[in-house]
Amino acid sequence: PVQAFAEVFRHFGIEPTSQEVREPMGMLKIDHIRTMLRMPRISALWEEKYGRKPEEKDVKELFGLFEEKLMSILHLFAGPKPGVAETVKALREKGIAIGSTTGYTDKMMAIVAPEAAKRGYAPDVWFSPDSVNQKGRPYPYMIFRNMEALGLSDVRGVLKVGDTVSDIREGKNAGVTTFGVVIGSSEMGLSREEYESLSEEEQKQRCEQVAEKFLAAGADRTILNLEDLLKTV
């Protein structure tokens, strides 16, 4: 959805940077837009263009256009990242249940979930912000809904794995052990091809930068990729 966020802001005459678009990744999508409009540079550009600061009606207008754009392309981006299906299969063989939280709405997940399942990823349960009164990440409530559905009573038996700062905050707010996945993460913002085109030293530097962000947000540990999870669980 990165491109959809950028295109929506461009439609309103604001050119966001890649960092501004990616910083709120993982949040409920309308909260993502709300957060971007509060960013000092974007807010100042909006005021310069429209003669006033961004308002809630602007949030809703941007989100309406964003949702329209996203729904038309979402099926193209619903596949799991490399290694996810295999890792989930291995975890299930160890008797571990798989739950999921998302920044997508139920309407969006009606497209994403079936497409992801076709491509090998289907969690036992998933919950969107629609199921928790729009209190998505970094609120912990989607994790608690997963625990309820899976019959878990102790947060010490839960491991949250995510690739955005809001994922990390969600996990820590829920009181569960939380890992950040570095390579291929929204926080890194590189495609697999872009990452592999970097020199070994550049890859190391980018990984360290992302890991530091996750640890600063409270992550208990960082892992380079999801396959590394099997070494710790």
What spans do the regions from the language model cover?
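N-terminal helical cap/lid subdomain that shapes the substrate entry/recognition surface
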Residues: P1-A85, K89-K94, A110
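A structural preference for short, hydrophobic beta-strand core positions in alpha/beta folds
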Residues: S18, S100, T222-L224
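Glycine- and other small-residue-rich loops at beta-strand/loop junctions that grip anionic moieties
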Residues: L76-F77, T101, K135
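Asp-based, Mg2+/Mn2+-dependent phosphohydrolase catalytic module
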Residues: A85, K89-A90, T105-V233
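Structural motif
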Residues: P24, T101-G103
